[in-house]
Amino acid sequence: MRTVLTGASGFVGSNIDKVLVDRHGDVVLSERVDMTDRDAVFAHVRSSQPDAVVHCAILNDWDLMHTDRRLAWKSYVEATRNYADAAAEIDVPFCLVSTDWVFDGTQGGATEDTPPNPINLYGFLKAASEIVALDRGGSVARVMGVNGTHWARPASPREQDPGFGYFVASLVDALETHQPFTVWEGDDINGVASPSLGAMCGEVIRQVIAGGHRGIFHCCGSATTTRRELAEATVDVFGLDRSLLRFGPAPPESFAGQTIPFDTSVSAVATAERLGTPLLSLGDLLASFRHERITGELAPLS
């Protein structure tokens, strides 16, 4: 397959790229284009002659999103419209990469059919983008609690944030150098989620576009976990020193001005049944990430 992929230099995008190229031998077309420029997007998609379009790029600047709402709308919703319409023009599958933050934090165990109810700007923009993608006959792949390797920048340090992404890498980086790590806990951050592995998300998305599937898909494992439970499982799988774990509130500056959904756990059973993709246990997910860190390669499919 030939796939136009936006956001390939980002964390999730680099995993999609890695899976498409290394596991499936696909060609990924990831030329940087101004995604808010409709003419430029159409020209790029037409000239690339892809078999599918995957839109993963975002405006990854929380402060700018809030200070320039017009730019935020253009960078999320209008950009999605541009790529979805460009894919429709040449009649190829379109997939939008979305998030569990389209839910409000009280909808634990949400399925692919659960109505979104975002409580912050990022979730709202993603939910609006989902409507655009689905209205144009595309698909939506929600990624959640994404951990794993940043293949475009594998040596870059990771920091814990109020969500679940990067959590495992930031913990392992600290404990492997014998530094204590404080696991954030509290009702004002994302305290419960369904973790995923970046490469696993890439595999789900590959199956979606290869099969020309439409609708909503969830990219995660089978487990619902708290931050504390994820930290303790990580210590066990990676063979780290549990005594270095600490537990406490997140620094206020880490989420200043943000409203964050507490419980974003979801079910991916329907996705697994529809696509035939595995639902990894938490232990298998962490073991796959450990394999990536040791070998620098994707773990075999379970």
Predicted feature residues:
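C-terminal amphipathic/interface module of NAD(P)-dependent oxidoreductases
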Residues: 243-244, 259-302
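N-terminal Rossmann NAD(P)H-binding glycine-rich loop of SDR-like oxidoreductase domains
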Residues: 1-20
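NAD(P)H-binding glycine-rich loop region in Rossmannoid oxidoreductase-like domains
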Residues: 35-78, 86, 101
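Conserved Rossmann-fold NAD(P)-dependent oxidoreductase catalytic core, especially the SDR/UDP-sugar
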Residues: 81-117
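Mid/C-terminal beta-alpha module of Rossmann-like enzyme folds, strongest
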Residues: 197-257, 290-302
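Glycine-rich Rossmann NAD(P)(H)-binding loop
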Residues: 183-192, 217-224, 274
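Active-site Tyr-X1-5-Lys
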Residues: 117-144, 169
